[in-house]
Regions:
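Bacterial Sec-dependent signal peptides at the C-terminal "C-region" and cleavage site
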Residues: 3-23
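Catalytic glycan-binding domains that act on GlcNAc-containing polysaccharides
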Residues: 16-142
Length: 142
């Protein structure tokens, strides 16, 4: 039902519906995750792990909340500048698009998170930390 409301809100031009107990950024992440078929608790955990939800985070060519690389965003249709990846809505949209691609490719959390992290050899610490963070969001979204 909530997924239907998110899709309907998107079609009507609304960015997202606020979710009680979540910040605006977190609500947007849940909204995009549901639209793109990614488990929302995993998307929230990735954003927390990558930037602690900080829209202005920049590190080694990674930008914004989801720490998206410009070249990666371009592969998913982004035509803007690196600075534009710092816009929370833009960053979340493309970050979750990458995560959705990884889920379609690997279909389960461990491999999908390794894919998102850009690993040729999977970073088990990153995966473990994201999965641990995801547990609290899974409980909050029930």
């Amino acid at each position: 039902m909530l997924t239907t409301l998110c899709v309907l809100a998107s079609l009507l031009g609304c960015q997202h519906l606020p979710i009680e107990g979540f910040t605006d950024v977190q609500s947007q992440i849940v909204h995009q995750a549901r639209i793109q078929g990614v488990p929302p608790h995993i998307a929230l955990a990735v954003a927390e792990q990558e930037s602690r939800f900080k829209p202005t985070a920049v590190s080694k060519g990674n930008y914004g909340i989801m720490q998206v690389q410009l070249g990666t965003a371009r592969r998913f249709g982004f035509t803007g500048t690196a600075k534009e990846l710092l816009d929370p809505n833009t960053n979340i949209k493309y970050g979750i698009a990458v995560l959705a691609h990884c889920y379609k490719k690997y279909a389960f959390d461990l491999m999908s998170l390794g894919c998102y992290n850009g690993a040729i050899t999977f970073n088990s610490t990153y995966i473990r930390e994201v999965l641990n963070k995801s547990k609290k969001y899974q409980l909050m979204l029930k």
